[in-house]
Swiss-Prot record:
It is an enzyme of class 1 (oxidoreductase). Glycans are attached at N143, N186, N886, N997, N1132. This is 3-hydroxy-3-methylglutaryl coenzyme A reductase mlcD. The gene is mlcD. Induction: Expression is induced at the beginning of the stationary phase, which is consistent with the timing of compactin production. Expression is controlled by the ML-236B/compactin cluster transcription regulator mlcR.
Amino acid sequence: MVASLLPSRFRGRESMNQQHPLRSGNRALTSTLQFLSKTACLHPIHTVCTIAILASTTYVGLLKDSFFHGPANVDKAEWGSLVEGSRSLITGPQNGWKWQSFDGDADVLGDFNHQALMTLVFPGSYGVASQAASPFLAPLPVNLSVIDLPSTSSPLTAYSKDKVFAFSVEYSSAPELVAAVQEIPNNSADLKLQETQLIEMERQMWIMKAARAHTKRSLAQWVHDTWTESLDLIKSAQTLDVVVMVLGYISMHLTFVSLFLSMKKLGSKVWLATSVLLSSTFAFLLGLDVAIRLGVPMSMRLLSEGLPFLVVIVGFEKSITLTRAVLSYAVQHRKPQKIQSDQGSVTAIAESTINYAVRSAIREKGYNIVCHYVVEILLLVIGAVLGIQGGLQHFCVLAALILFFDCLLLFTFYTAILSIKLEVNRLKRHINMRYALEDEGLSQRTAESVATSNDAQDSARTYLFGNDMKGSSVPKFKFWMVVGFLIVNLVNIGSTLFQASSSGSLSSISSWTESLSGSAIKPPLEPFKVAGSGLDELLFQARGRGQSTMVTVLAPIKYELEYPSIHRGTSQLHEYGVGGKMVGSLLTSLEDPVLSKWVFVALALSVALNSYLFKAARLGIKDPNLPSHPVDPVELDQAESFNAAQNQTPQIQSSLQAPQTRVFTPTTTDSDSDASLVLIKASLKVTKRAEGKTATSELPVSRTQIELDNLLKQNTISELNDEDVVALSLRGKVPGYALEKSLKDCTRAVKVRRSIISRTPATAELTSMLEHSKLPYENYAWERVLGACCENVIGYMPVPVGVAGPIVIDGKSYFIPMATTEGVLVASASRGSKAINLGGGAVTVLTGDGMTRGPCVKFDVLERAGAAKIWLDSDVGQTVMKEAFNSTSRFARLQSMRTTIAGTHLYIRFKTTTGDAMGMNMISKGVEHALNVMATEAGFSDMNIITLSGNYCTDKKPSALNWIDGRGKGIVAEAIIPANVVRDVLKSDVDSMVQLNISKNLIGSAMAGSVGGFNAQAANLAAAIFIATGQDPAQVVESANCITLMNNLRGSLQISVSMPSIEVGTLGGGTILEPQGAMLDMLGVRGSHPTTPGENARQLARIIGSAVLAGELSLCAALAAGHLVKAHMAHNRSAPASSAPSRSVSPSGGTRTVPVPNNALRPSAAATDRARR
């Protein structure tokens, strides 16, 4: 319990996955915090605005109360007020003629010569005027004896340039002197110039600041006074105190820097750190307002000295802890989460990401955070109760109030900010994914659909900024939120500054500081800093006379060059001109009770309207890209019909085929219905829409061709029944590729297309069985396939998906999904994974990351091709092409270019990074633009672009260039298998496997002239994972480039695979489909990486390399032990000899001679016919 109260930096960071059961003592507190945070998160914008307005009103109230109702100036031009805070010193033969502090009654020292040492300070900002000021210019009483003393300088005297006069006078006569020097004539050289001014009715004089009437000065005057008082405070303070304060302010600013750096590590450069500072500022304002209302005396000096140390001691650790927990749980919630229902079944969590993250973070960290606040507040309360002197008692009360409000705002205001941050992160991920998919060539509608489905789970599907937001919405929201807050505060301050007081004068900021210091303790006086030289002079005189002396050193008395009318507090409204009068009159008119009520009603209506607009924004806007009308008839006329081999329309009834014998399959197909029912109601088929509504009625095909043409002209294709659509398509009236758009139902379009292909006369002999075949087509998200993955869809091909593993890769366990129809492959990979795990797991290294595209350009002569190559290889060419290429996408970045010449043909190999997308379409767009810039701006207008892909990439083909230079991700994976694991799990030995690898993978592949094929079955594993995770299967050609190496390392088997060209992506292409996306979710690499673009794709490449490592290990062990054929026979065949044809085993450990039929080598009938012609 005691350890939990310590800050986390003293206890070490705990795991996010470590769940602590809630004790009965903190369950109620946690529930309360979760309720407050949930309320704030449900309406974050309203919460932020409400608290911001409340805090703004609080400090404006502080200013107004101080301006208009604050007490009068504490300092008075009276002896009783000036002598407060003075210090008395005594010297004489009894103490060796040394100054000694004396705090007793002066009457006790009857034989002492009691002197009052006074210091008059005239500001140096008035130039020559201060030189003419002298206290002896004032009319002094005749019996008053004044001794002139040397002034005392300080290190800041050169900067302030103040004129200081020091003198001593009998203590009993000091009040008369104070009354005489309240006003001192100004005999400067500028006096004649002042007398010539006609407007001037009185002469300026040096007036004691404390003698002025309580008038409200301007902002410039307040700044000047504050600066002067700060310099005086520094001059009178001890050097050690100044050093401590400087260190305190430096530490405070370092704490601010640490806050920004910590938030930057969490993914926020400015936003969250600024919000934390804003929350703390609001807490300070609320605490200060409550403290003043409770009667706690405050002063600007006390605040300026105490706040830096409060910031350093308390810090922002609690806000950082809560932020880290919320963001971490938000990332966890993006993965599929499961909960156990009351009935024991597993159901998906419907809670939104924001609510889940905040609730879980508060459940884990909320109690500890509140405990830290409570401990800190208790310590401050104890300090206040103990009565610490020197103003610290008052500051302890203020600090306790600040921490209380800081705790309250942390779970309301700041959690609302965090909810907005999470929504901004979701919006950024959504927009970045959508842009990346659009760069990959997907339509905007498909990209939006995929990006929406990849958002975090949200049952309500309501967002703070609406459903249709652009990438510029996030910075616009931040900008206008900050601007709005600043405008509100500036208006509040401006209204306060220009609001007229009861006497008609303008407000003064100095009144606030004076009211805060109304009952504060004055700072202790340092006599030797104030009048060190004067004390030395008095000591010298007392020693010479041999008389004991007592000196009372007063605080410096400051003067200002003012008009004598300052005593009357005259209005200075004319200094502000007509504008100030107009603003003051306007603000005064608002004090009218009727007008103020109307203003309140208008404000209420504004709040209600804004609430309505916020609600409307949350509902979002419908996607305007959804099709609202059928395909243009002009496009229909130009489209190619399905029945291109026959012009006349076949009879629909004659196209029906006899139903096949029904066989049940795991997936619903048309053959699942009764055979006789299919035959009887083939023309009465009822098609169901995706929305569950009936699309067609059970009407026989009785319309004539003329009626169908008339209906077609009316653009009512979607209202026709299936048989009518088939008839129109067979006549070429409805193009097959446009069925989805025409019917507005993807599943129905796939079904109709199957019927059309089955009834096409040109291929009816082969395709007649397709309409009622076992190829499934229902219950599939065809909307994602449309315009993205496949065209002319007739169904989907289910492939078994197994999982190999688990396998430990770089210290983390994975199950590897593999889509394959080859038996033993998954089991073999699992056996290899087990052996790797027993050896400590696989270790991977990323050696390269860059997708390539190699266009071909041609010039008329070789010299121009050579010049282009030299320019492209130069720094200038590289820079120009990089700028042109990078301007086409926010994700693709050109790394390098490699060029080669063949005659007048120039081949350029662009190598780029593409984030988490595989990026071929993205690169093609960038290459095209870069080549256009090269032709138009680089002086190669005679360049002829032959093709964007000149096979110099090289894509989907074996290539030594890919093997040497790499393409996509380059991965090296290694594992060390102990000898006993090789013996017990792999049933082999280390030396046998090393020798097998040399003979098979190295020498055997070299003898075959292989390029990148120095492995046993890398393509097997790569293809299975490619298909399961939505990769391009054709790119297995180069992705399976691999060399397997084995070595006997101190008795253990060291195995590694090097794969320089794994071409994968976790965004776009087949990864947008839900089944493939689910497999990526199982690996934790779906979509784009939240913080490091491209990291998900690189991690997928590491997983593939490690899976290949497991497969290589297991297969080589089986080959070394001679178990391969036996394993395949056991897993793939029910009996050793089967009449059913079996697929070939690849690779095989043994060889069997199969007799070849005599007619197998004969040419086909078509080949014989071509030979005759």
